[in-house]
């Protein structure tokens, strides 16, 4: 039996949690259970340690450095552990760094033993899986997940930035003899924050470069391609966390202009897919309200730019 579990913070079971979707994607790939909250994982043979989508190198401890229950459980466990996505952090060193302001229980815990256990744990990355399908994109890539696919997620990456790097750069670490399809999903961030800052027709050049880069991927790796159109645009009243701001604002350009740009991107992507024999994909029209806006009900609660996992192309 296999489980996905977190040691330093509880995995959320909220069905609208975009952050929680990464654990569910891993669970789908590994055919594993997700251990939510502080539930026990001792009945499992193998446990893959989930560090969250945005591991910062420290513990986010509600109420301060007091409770060591989860660390003691991990230290005592006989399960075989693996670290998802990143090298196993030194939880012992992180715990010791909080000794100046902590509970007696925290101060007396054997952090050195925890360090030694962390050293024994092997990292598992998506690129180790050698699956047939790869999805490459920004943080919205989760929303187009299809069962048993590798996901190469680059939070905050614009289409422009990805093209400057070259799309082959993202495929190369995942390439193997079984890889036969790659799906690309970029562009939402460009539309939200960047492309309307330039009144020089740069969107035409961006789409032309996108097509050329996609051709390079197909020529080099001989894979089928799918390209996803940008997500529908939500109403401007949507409250967003400051992490979604750029240059102090939640978006640049009004709804009409950004929607026009989204339609341009979608039309050009569909046209290049038609000409080159690639698959064109876009989110369901049912995600829009009667004004043509992305419905808040379909978005992560309480505030985010992302879809709720309930409304992904394939519900997790």
PLM features: residue spans?
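Catalytic core of nucleotide-activated saccharide and alditol-phosphate transferases
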Residues: 65-130, 231-233
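Surface-exposed, active-site-proximal loop segments in enzymatic domains
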Residues: 61-63, 95, 191-202, 236-250, ...
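N-terminal pre-catalytic "stem/leader" segment of glycosyltransferase-like enzymes
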Residues: 1-51, 87-117, 134-135, 143-144, ...
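Substrate-gating cap/lid alpha-helix
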Residues: 99, 235-284, 304-305, 310-314
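Extracellular serine-dependent O-acyl
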Residues: 82-84, 224-231, 260-298, 316
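Conserved SGNH/GDSL esterase-like catalytic core that processes O-acyl groups on lipids
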Residues: 11-12, 16-24, 28-31, 40-50, ...
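Active-site segments of SGNH/GDSL-like serine hydrolases
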Residues: 81-95, 187-190, 216-258, 285-290
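Well-ordered, non-membrane alpha-helical segments in soluble/globular domains
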Residues: 17-26, 58-73, 102-115, 163-173, ...
């Amino acid at each position: 039996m296999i489980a996905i579990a977190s040691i330093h913070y509880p995995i959320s079971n909220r069905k609208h949690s975009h952050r929680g979707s990464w654990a569910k994607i891993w669970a789908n790939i590994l055919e594993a259970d997700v251990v939510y909250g502080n539930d026990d994982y001792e009945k499992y043979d193998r446990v893959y340690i989930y560090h969250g989508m945005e591991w910062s190198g420290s513990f986010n401890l509600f109420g301060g450095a007091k409770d060591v229950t989860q660390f003691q459980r991990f230290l005592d466990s006989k399960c075989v552990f693996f670290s998802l996505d990143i090298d196993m952090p030194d939880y012992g060193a992180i715990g010791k760094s909080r000794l100046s302001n902590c509970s007696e229980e925290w101060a007396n815990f054997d952090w050195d033993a925890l360090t030694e256990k962390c050293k024994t744990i092997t990292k598992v990355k998506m690129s180790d899986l050698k699956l047939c399908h790869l999805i490459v994109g920004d943080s919205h890539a989760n929303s187009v997940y299809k069962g048993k696919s590798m996901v190469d997620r680059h939070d905050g990456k614009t289409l422009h930035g990805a093209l400057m790097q070259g799309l082959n750069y993202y495929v190369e670490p995942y390439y193997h003899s079984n890889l036969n399809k790659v799906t690309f999903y970029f562009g939402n961030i460009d539309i939200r924050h960047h492309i309307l800052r330039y009144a020089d027709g740069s969107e035409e050049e961006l789409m032309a470069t996108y097509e050329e880069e996609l051709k390079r991927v197909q020529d080099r790796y001989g894979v089928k391609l799918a390209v996803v159109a940008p997500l529908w645009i939500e109403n401007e009243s949507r409250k967003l966390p400051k992490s979604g701001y750029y240059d102090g604002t939640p978006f640049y350009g009004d709804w009409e202009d950004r929607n026009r740009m989204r339609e341009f991107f979608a039309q050009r992507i569909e046209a290049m897919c038609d000409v080159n024999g690639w698959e064109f994909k876009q989110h369901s029209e049912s995600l829009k309200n009667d004004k043509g806006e992305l419905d808040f009900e379909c978005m992560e609660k309480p505030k985010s730019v992302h879809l709720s996992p309930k409304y992904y192309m394939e519900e997790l």
